């Protein structure tokens, strides 16, 4: 027969379970073989004899007949009859088996008497098979075991009908094999065709029936879900308005929807589809385009377990799609019960990742967006852009009434972790002298400062200070307290700020309690916001210790190296201080770095002069509490000239009797005393900030002198001192650059200080610095 043609019955044929013919017999296998197609066969003794002789090998492979039970004469081909009852056609892969009707051509006229004679032989053979065959059912021999359940003679009623129209359709369709219909090729001469198929755990073959053909197939005239179905076969589902499921649609079929919600099948026949079957496991295909970035990967399916998913008879029917991969031969099963979702919304599904579908099922993956727009109401599996699950279930993060359970891995904490002392790592008792310390270090620091003890380290000033060894070396403990930032002035400043806040609160309460002030606006409002000078007092850096060992004989190299290391730490403190100045961080970041690179020596020299003025009456240079340059140390080589410039600043502060508020304002103005010749990126804002602190210096002068005629004279003297700082800093920088470039002196520089000097050297050599002076020379 022609392999390119399909065996398609006419539209007027009734797909009933019992079919009649005028000159033939009717065999009904549907009662025994569920899932098989009802077959209509017209048999002749001649054709059956020829088929028996040509396919004798197939019969021997099919069943084992007992000796003497059936004669070796002409026997009807049982493999064809039973195979056709199962809806399988193994001879030609492109031939399609349709619906519940199966027709195939025969040659010549078929007589009723010959058909009855052959039918008797068939019944005898089946009876012998019933006595000899006792093989239990299993997933791989489910089709073979169906043969033993053949119907008896009374199940084949003899009726007659006119089949002339069918013979017209089948006329001339005989092949080159002499008119005999050959159901199997040489390499397919076996009846148990399911032995090579490995069914998945969710496939129909794993059911109690142990037969994948005992499920209701979703078929029409143009498609059949069988292992021989090609990738072009369609899958059509029955849908109604109560179903909340979207069928998988291939590109070649586009179902339509009626007004009542039913699907209009694209098939040419009006075959009533069976009720969709509910299976044991539930699978959900999660497609979230627009929510998660899509990658060109194979679709991954998730298995969701919902309670009550196998309820049969619910109005909300489930999806059950059965298909076979043509590449791997493995059957997959996907279904979803939406009734349990709508009934138990608060039940959270458990998702397990299922491996991607093989290549043969890629057509199923293209169901997204392949149908018409009106099909989106049929299901909620492939809604694009949806951020929550269908049927009212949403993720816990999207539902305010559902709180996610706490993680089992999180440990219950009774309270916050204990805070440790920054000096000895013991449990801290609070913030003492501006630092979080324990009570022991608090008392030690207070006694060390007030008692003015001159502690000396017996080692190398690097002793370990912890809870056990903190009493071994008081010198290193005191040094660590200073490095942590402990300062007695911090306590006084805290009390001062607290007193100002209490006074301000008392004044505001008195003003609010006075009924006369409720309607009358006072002439002068109290100063509720802190002044710039008070803020400058709070952010002033703490005094740092140099860690210099006075027991070792002094040398220029050791003193210079110690001063450089101290200078590097002071630069870091100056950067933090500058960032805390009101208005400074509003400047461009490049401008902030430029101002710090130009003014770091101004800040350290002016602070050194202030400490020397307050602690030694400008006679000594107090670099640190543990490093004071006296007259004896000044006589060391290369020390006197530099110390002379620094003593000038201290002597001027002592001569003018500069107050602390004036010193803070002058120090801030020194930060803003040098700019590049090309100007800053935020030059206007810089000029505004600088003018603000010039006015603050004037306010500090008025606060000290009062409304006297000497205010302008003092302002002139203080600004003149600021201008003289340029000459002092210039001499100090020249010596610093010389020692930095002269490697023979072997003077060490900290990393940050070396970086600043490296960036500053070319600017000074090129003269790219503009001095902001108050007075002309």
Curated annotation (Swiss-Prot):
Compositional bias segments (type: Low complexity): 134-150, 394-414
Covalent cross-link (Glycyl lysine isopeptide (Lys-Gly) (interchain with G-Cter in ubiquitin)), residues: 419
Region of interest called Interaction with CRY1, as start-end residue ranges on this chain: 532-697
Major subcellular site: cytoplasm
Residue numbers bearing the N6-acetyllysine modification: 480, 492, 494-495
Zn finger (NR C4-type) location: 421-441, 457-481
Modified residues (Phosphoserine): 45, 113, 134, 141, 203, 211, 226, 267, 404
Portion annotated as DNA-binding: 421-486
Entry domain remark: Composed of three domains: a modulating N-terminal domain, a DNA-binding domain and a C-terminal ligand-binding domain. The ligand-binding domain is required for correct chromosome segregation during mitosis although ligand binding is not required.
Similarity field: Belongs to the nuclear hormone receptor family. NR3 subfamily.
Name of the protein described by the UniProt record: Glucocorticoid receptor
């Amino acid at each position: 027969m022609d392999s390119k043609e399909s065996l398609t019955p006419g539209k007027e044929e009734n797909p009933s379970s019992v079919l009649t013919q005028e000159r033939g017999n009717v065999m009904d296998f549907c009662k025994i073989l569920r899932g098989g197609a009802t077959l209509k066969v017209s048999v002749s003794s001649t054709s059956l004899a020829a088929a028996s002789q040509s396919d004798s090998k197939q019969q021997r492979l099919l069943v084992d007949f007992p000796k003497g039970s059936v004669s070796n004469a002409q026997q009807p081909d049982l493999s064809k009859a039973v195979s056709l009852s199962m809806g399988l056609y193994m001879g030609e892969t492109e031939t399609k088996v349709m619906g519940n009707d199966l027709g195939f051509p025969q040659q010549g006229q078929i007589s009723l008497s010959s058909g009855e004679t052959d039918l008797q032989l068939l019944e005898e053979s089946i009876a012998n098979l019933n006595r000899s065959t006792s093989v239990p059912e299993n997933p791989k021999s489910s089709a073979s075991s169906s043969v033993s359940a053949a119907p008896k003679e009374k199940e084949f009623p003899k009726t007659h009908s006119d089949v002339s129209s069918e013979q017209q359709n089948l006329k001339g369709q005989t092949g080159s094999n002499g008119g005999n219909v050959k159901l199997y090729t040489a390499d397919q001469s076996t009846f148990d065709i399911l032995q090579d198929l490995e069914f998945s755990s969710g496939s129909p073959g794993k059911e109690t029936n142990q037969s994948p053909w005992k499920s209701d197939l979703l078929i029409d005239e143009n498609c059949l879900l069988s292992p021989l179905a090609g990738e072009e076969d369609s899958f059509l589902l029955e849908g109604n308005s109560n179903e909340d499921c979207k069928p998988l649609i291939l590109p070649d079929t586009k179902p339509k929807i009626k007004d009542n919600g039913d699907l209009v099948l694209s098939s040419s026949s009006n075959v009533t589809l069976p009720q969709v079957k509910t299976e044991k496991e539930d699978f959900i295909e999660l497609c979230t385009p627009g929510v998660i970035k899509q990658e060109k990967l194979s679709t991954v399916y998730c298995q969701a377990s919902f309670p009550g998913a196998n309820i049969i008879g619910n109005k909300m029917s489930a999806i059950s799609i059965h298909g076979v991969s043509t590449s791997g031969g493995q059957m997959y099963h996907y279904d979803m019960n939406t009734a349990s979702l709508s009934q138990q919304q608060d039940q959270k599904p458990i998702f397990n990742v299922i491996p991607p579908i093989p290549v043969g099922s890629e057509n199923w993956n293209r169901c997204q967006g392949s149908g018409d727009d009106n099909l989106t109401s049929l299901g909620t599996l492939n809604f694009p852009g949806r951020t929550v699950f269908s049927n009212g279930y949403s993720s816990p993060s999207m539902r305010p009434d559902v709180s996610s359970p706490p993680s089992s891995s999180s440990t219950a904490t009774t309270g916050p972790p204990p805070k440790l002392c920054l000096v000895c790592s013991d449990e801290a008792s609070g913030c003492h002298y501006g630092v979080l310390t324990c009570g022991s270090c608090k008392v030690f620091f207070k006694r060390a400062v007030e008692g003015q003890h001159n502690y000396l380290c017996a080692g190398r000033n690097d002793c370990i200070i912890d809870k056990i060894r903190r009493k071994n070396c008081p010198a290193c403990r005191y040094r660590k307290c200073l490095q942590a930032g402990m300062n007695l002035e911090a306590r006084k400043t805290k009390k001062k700020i607290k007193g100002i806040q209490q006074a301000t609160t008392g004044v505001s309460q008195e003003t609010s309690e006075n009924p006369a002030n409720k309607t009358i606006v006072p002439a002068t409002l109290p100063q509720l916001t802190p002044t710039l000078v008070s803020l400058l007092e709070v952010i002033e850096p703490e005094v740092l210790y140099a860690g210099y060992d006075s027991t070792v004989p002094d040398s220029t190299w050791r003193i210079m190296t110690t001063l450089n290391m101290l200078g590097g730490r002071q630069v870091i403190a100056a950067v933090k201080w500058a960032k805390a100045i009101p208005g400074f961080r509003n400047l461009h970041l490049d401008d902030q770095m430029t101002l710090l690179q130009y003014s770091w020596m101004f800040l350290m020299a002016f602070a050194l002069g202030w400490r020397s003025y307050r602690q030694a009456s400008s006679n000594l240079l107090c670099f640190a509490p543990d490093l004071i340059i006296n007259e004896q140390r000044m006589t060391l080589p290369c020390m006197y000239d530099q110390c002379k410039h620094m003593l000038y600043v201290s002597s001027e502060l002592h001569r003018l009797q500069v107050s602390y508020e004036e010193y803070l304002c002058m120090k801030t103005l020194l930060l803003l005393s040098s700019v590049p010749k090309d100007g800053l990126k935020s030059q206007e804002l810089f000029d505004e900030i600088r003018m603000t602190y010039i006015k603050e210096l004037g306010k500090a002068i008025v606060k000290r002198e009062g409304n006297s005629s000497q205010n302008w004279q003092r302002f002139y003297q203080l600004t003149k001192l600021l201008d003289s700082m340029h000459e002092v800093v210039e001499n100090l920088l020249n010596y610093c650059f010389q020692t930095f470039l002269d490697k023979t002196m072997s003077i060490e520089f900290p990393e940050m200080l070396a970086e600043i000097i490296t960036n500053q050297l070319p600017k000074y050599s090129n003269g790219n610095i503009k001095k902001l002076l108050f007075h002309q020379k």
